[in-house]
């Protein structure tokens, strides 16, 4: 009898992803930008829509972990509720900058929430976000998820 299971199409976005880009500079001199998909935002900003949201939020470089909230309901929040730095390590990076282990932080960072609207994400959100990150002039970008 023939296998009647439906063929599963691979994740549409996978052929566009580049998971790694080697860093060739000196980490001690690198200005770092944070980009997260964990739904992190300033507590005063509009929440991400938990059912799906293709927008992103800008987080000022001077923000601390205490200023942040997160909305994505698609991962376990146990650790993040104790310390948001496990999903958006802004305080830890600031400590590394004070210790001269990195060059510093950009004046703004970025976060997105959950979405399955991959075409809109790929064609609209990601290009806009990439331009924003480029304008922040980082030497390195740290990507985090939830």
Predicted regions mapped to residue ranges:
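An N-terminal assembly and electron-transfer interface module characteristic of large anaerobic redox
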Residues: 1-146
């Amino acid at each position: 009898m023939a296998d009647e299971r439906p063929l599963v199409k691979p994740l549409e976005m996978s052929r566009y992803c580049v998971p790694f880009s080697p860093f060739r500079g000196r980490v001690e001199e690198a200005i770092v930008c944070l980009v997260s998909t964990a739904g992190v935002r300033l507590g005063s900003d509009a929440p991400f829509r938990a059912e799906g949201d293709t927008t992103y939020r800008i987080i000022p470089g001077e923000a601390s972990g205490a200023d942040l909230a997160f909305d994505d309901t698609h991962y376990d929040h146990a650790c993040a509720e104790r310390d948001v730095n496990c999903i958006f390590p802004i305080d830890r990076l600031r400590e590394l900058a004070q210790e001269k282990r990195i060059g510093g932080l950009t004046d703004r960072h970025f976060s997105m929430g959950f979405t399955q609207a991959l075409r809109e994400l790929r064609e609209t959100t990601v290009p806009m976000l990439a331009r924003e990150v480029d304008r922040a002039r980082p030497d390195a970008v740290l990507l985090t998820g939830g």
